[in-house]
Amino acid sequence: MKNLFISILAFFNISAIFCQINPKNIEIVRDQYGVPHIYGKTDADVAYGLAWAHREDDFKTIQEGYLAGNGVLSKHIGLKGAGADLITQVIESKETVDKLYNTLSPDFIEILQAYSQGMNKYAEEFPEKVLVKKLFPITPKKMARYSFLTLFIDNGADRLVSDIFQNNVKNDFFFSDNMNGSNAIALNSKKIGKNETFLAINPHQPFDGPTSWYEAHLISEQG
């Protein structure tokens, strides 16, 4: 019993440490292009600041991602979100995250907690921008569920689930004579008449939406 008490006490002490984010230790400076340069005393401070910058720039899209990852997108967009909600249930995102969450390092969990605090604080100060109240408060586990769904979709497994429900699964769906590819072109300096070499690639990333890239400069005094 004594060991159990000590373990519980240690858990709450660690949680308390993780939750101590002082916004005064965080500075967000945007350059002429709007790119946020985020300064903080610790990695957790910077994560909190990054969450705040994300929300300033596109709170709606980030919420939609988390709604899908937690199986409640249909509460926002109706039947159009039912497919994503169904996939989240089929792949058992919640059960998988609950099972594997404790395998994450304490340092990483601290970063997740700090980021979620930044999101929750923004939602608290701008409640009119919240899409679905049930999504909040955001927790590290809710964030991890969205990451799990993203990995599933990035590997094309969502299309397989769709084929299964439509009874349209083919034995050769992994291999095809008409497989798509991508191009990368390297331009030598001698070819372009400049003392530079260029590499043209297609990152297959859209300019907006949940899979678009985001530029930020993170500076932590922690290292």
Positions of PLM-derived features:
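Bacterial Sec-dependent N-terminal signal peptides
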Residues: 1-21
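Substrate-recognition/specificity elements adjacent to catalytic centers across diverse enzyme folds
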Residues: 22-223
